[in-house]
């Protein structure tokens, strides 16, 4: 077991004392960094980059060379599981991910395999092992997966969607087929995340990017229920340490109490939720991650610093806050603005920790 030199992030997730508020950024390996663009060009395309352990490791480490971040997150994609199920993932210029064989009916669902994390998804585990080795205990490594509902939206819609009419048609016209798909995905995600933990991920996060498009009742039945099943099935200790679990539903600020009942350690917040309100509601039960609007990084550094100060003051004194953006960093943000953000979090947060 490599001794962690900086365990602030893991401690904050477990609501333990820290010296300053830890910070990392979602999608922080990405197109806003010139070094990422160079590595992606070397790989040829996005999935080739994900499937090459050495290059995936390189782009995971790039932001850490620029910024004093408190955690690294595996460079991968949420659609690795549907890809491993044989749906034919490809990326259309300007349109994002697409599938050649989307799921259209119950018969399609029944044919889907549950992928072997060390087989079809072995390239992800190789990347986790490579990154852990190269991190040399500097900061913890976060593993992740999409939620069953979010993965299902891409699989049924055939790619990205604005209105989600195809999956909602299945949800209301053939709920049995959708539940079968979500159950299969929950089993797949549980196996996948546990394999990441065994390979070296020290914390895991479930991204429910599209849970917020559901009604409250549908969210409980079609998204949260399956995330709860996953949390129940996860390894919560490895290598002598607790492995914290974070749930993040974009647009899910109205359901924090229900999310906190799943047994997760932390909840991710998007920028539409007031962090002071969130702490009042669930801070006694879970840590909170977030939640600056990613577009704030277009502002001058002084304005970014003001926003960081406001969010820190909103959370207030004490433990259980991991600073992050409310979603992924945008691809055309000036890298020096991201640096100003990270520096401001560390400098301004010390006063909130005794």
UniProtKB/Swiss-Prot annotation:
It catalyses: uroporphyrinogen III + 4 H(+) = coproporphyrinogen III + 4 CO2. One of its GO terms (biological process) is protoporphyrinogen IX biosynthetic process from glutamate. GO terms for molecular function: uroporphyrinogen decarboxylase activity. InterPro entries: UROD/MetE-like_sf (IPR038071), Uroporphyrinogen_deCO2ase_HemE (IPR006361), Uroporphyrinogen_deCOase (IPR000257). The record marks 77 as: Transition state stabilizer. Keywords: Cytoplasm, Decarboxylase, Lyase, Porphyrin biosynthesis. Its main location: cytoplasm. The keyword Hydrolase does not apply. Substrate binds at residues 27-31, 46, 77, 154, 209, 327. It is an enzyme of class 4 (lyase). Coiled coil: none annotated. One of its GO terms (cellular component) is cytosol. Its EC number is 4.1.1.37. Pathway: Porphyrin-containing compound metabolism; protoporphyrin-IX biosynthesis; coproporphyrinogen-III from 5-aminolevulinate: step 4/4. It is found in: Cytoplasm. SUPFAM superfamilies: UROD/MetE-like (SSF51726). CDD domains: URO-D. Catalyzes the decarboxylation of four acetate groups of uroporphyrinogen-III to yield coproporphyrinogen-III. Homodimer. Belongs to the uroporphyrinogen decarboxylase family. This is Uroporphyrinogen decarboxylase. It comes from Salmonella typhimurium (strain LT2 / SGSC1412 / ATCC 700720).
């Amino acid at each position: 077991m490599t001794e962690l030199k900086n365990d602030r992030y893991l401690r904050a997730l477990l609501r333990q004392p820290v010296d300053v508020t830890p910070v990392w950024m979602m999608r922080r390996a990405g197109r806003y960094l010139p070094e990422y663009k160079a590595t992606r060009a070397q790989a040829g395309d996005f999935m080739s980059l994900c499937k090459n352990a050495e290059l995936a490791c390189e782009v995971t480490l790039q932001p850490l060379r620029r910024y004093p971040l408190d955690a690294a997150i595996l460079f991968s994609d949420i659609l690795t599981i549907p890809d491993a199920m044989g749906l034919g993932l490809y990326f259309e210029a300007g349109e994002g991910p697409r599938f050649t064989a989307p799921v259209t009916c119950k018969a399609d669902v029944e044919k889907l395999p549950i992928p072997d994390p060390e087989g079809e998804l072995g390239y992800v585990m190789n990347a986790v092992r490579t990154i852990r080795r190269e991190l040399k205990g500097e900061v913890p490594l976060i593993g992740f997966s999409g939620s069953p509902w979010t993965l299902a939206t891409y699989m049924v819609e055939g790619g990205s969607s604005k209105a989600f009419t195809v999956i909602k048609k299945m949800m209301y016209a053939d709920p049995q087929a959708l539940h079968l798909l979500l159950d299969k995905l929950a089993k797949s995600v549980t196996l996948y995340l546990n394999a990441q933990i065994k390979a070296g991920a020290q914390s895991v996060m479930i991204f429910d990017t599209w849970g917020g498009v559901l009604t409250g009742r549908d969210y409980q039945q079609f998204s949260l229920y399956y995330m709860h099943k996953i949390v129940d099935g996860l390894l919560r200790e490895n290598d002598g340490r607790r492995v914290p679990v974070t749930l993040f539903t974009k647009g899910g600020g109205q359901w924090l109490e229900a999310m906190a009942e799943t047994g997760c350690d932390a909840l991710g917040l998007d920028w539409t939720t007031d962090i002071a309100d969130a702490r009042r509601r669930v801070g006694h039960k879970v840590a909170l991650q977030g939640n600056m609007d990613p577009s704030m990084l277009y502002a001058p550094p002084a304005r970014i610093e003001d926003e960081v100060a406001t969010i820190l003051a909103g959370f207030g004194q004490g433990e259980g806050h991991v600073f992050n953006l409310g979603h992924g960093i945008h691809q055309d943000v000036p890298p020096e603005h991201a640096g100003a953000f990270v520096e401001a979090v560390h400098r301004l947060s010390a006063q909130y920790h005794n």
